[in-house]
UniProtKB/Swiss-Prot annotation:
This is Expansin-like A2. Residues 51-156 form the Expansin-like EG45 domain. Glycans are attached at N113, N158. GO terms for biological process: plant-type cell wall loosening. One of its GO terms (cellular component) is extracellular region. The keyword 4Fe-4S does not apply. SUPFAM superfamilies: Barwin-like endoglucanases, PHL pollen allergen. Belongs to the expansin family. Expansin-like A subfamily. Residues 171-254 form the Expansin-like CBD domain. It is found in: Secreted. The keyword Hydrolase does not apply. Induction: Down-regulated by gibberellin (GA3).
Length: 275
């Protein structure tokens, strides 16, 4: 998968349209780089986070060592926030380290009880100083500060596409993006037969899930617009991502990992450095 400039005025217009859409979604939560202050709680069982609103299912357990989180509606952004990463640290210096824990959003916390994030038990314990995890868990919620950070996966772990079970080859294709790196949002997805310039747009179903009822014949390549703040660009595969006979329920490697960090045009909402 490569990053390229658009080759025609028509393509440029499409990019502009989707960048504007992406800006609207991103502006809901303000500046990603800002340090925010709130409370964070935790869930004793990670099952709810694995089976959360983002629809990752059992695959969520492979995200970030199981350090997962449910996010408030403002951070979840109607599903656009699925897969986003946040660095979270509690403000009790006796119990918690200054490093905190990095979490991946897999669910929405609809009833937040004034908490912006509800962490998995493993992530909550990871905020603690050595030997203090048990004591930290006796407090169901703590004051925290957090900010969005780039997602980083192990070397060799690329952006991947899961073909959802509701897909019906060859025309009805529903996919879900997994392991998205960087600090951007995917705001547009196109699919085409490998070697063809006849791209078909896909519609966002919810969060990381996209679909089309007019999938072209395989093998298939994809291109996406990644954006956040005011910056956006196409990222796409030069070769095959899904084979000619793709299969529902399988995960396919996109052959690339996104490492971009979105540029923002907003005034810093917090001048305190993250130390």
């Amino acid at each position: 998968m490569a990053v390229r400039c658009c080759s025609s005025m028509a393509s440029a217009s499409v990019v502009l349209f989707f960048v504007v859409v992406g800006m609207s979604a991103s502006m809901v939560s303000g500046c990603d780089r800002c340090v925010r202050r709130s409370k964070a709680g935790f869930r004793d069982s990670s099952i709810a986070l694995n089976a959360g609103s983002c629809g990752y299912g059992s695959l969520a357990a492979s995200f970030n060592g199981g350090h997962l989180a449910a996010a408030s509606p403002a951070l979840f952004r109607g599903g656009v926030g699925c897969g986003a990463c946040f660095q979270v640290r509690c403000k009790d210096g006796k119990l918690c380290s200054t490093a905190g824990a990095k979490v991946v959003v897999t669910d929405e916390a609809r009833s937040t009880n004034r908490t912006d994030l509800v962490l998995s038990a493993a992530a909550y314990a990871a905020m603690a100083r050595p030997g203090m995890a048990a004591q930290l868990r006796t407090r169901r919620a703590v004051d925290v500060e957090y900010k969005r950070v780039p997602c980083e996966y192990a070397a060799g772990r690329n952006l991947s596409i899961r073909v959802e079970e509701k897909s019906r080859p060859p025309r009805e294709l529903s996919i879900r993006f997994l392991y998205q790196g960087g600090q951007t949002d995917i705001v547009a997805v196109d699919v085409a037969t490998v070697g063809s310039s006849n791209w078909k747009f896909m519609t966002r179903d919810y969060g990381p899930a996209w679909s089309t009822a007019q999938a072209p014949a395989g093998p298939l390549q994809f291109r996406v617009v990644v954006t956040g703040g005011y910056d956006g660009k196409w990222v796409w595969a030069d070769g095959e991502v899904l084979p000619r006979r793709w299969t529902a329920g399988r995960v396919y490697d996109a052959g690339v990992q996104i490492a971009d960090v979105a540029q923002e045009g907003c005034y810093p909402c917090d001048t305190q450095e993250w130390k």
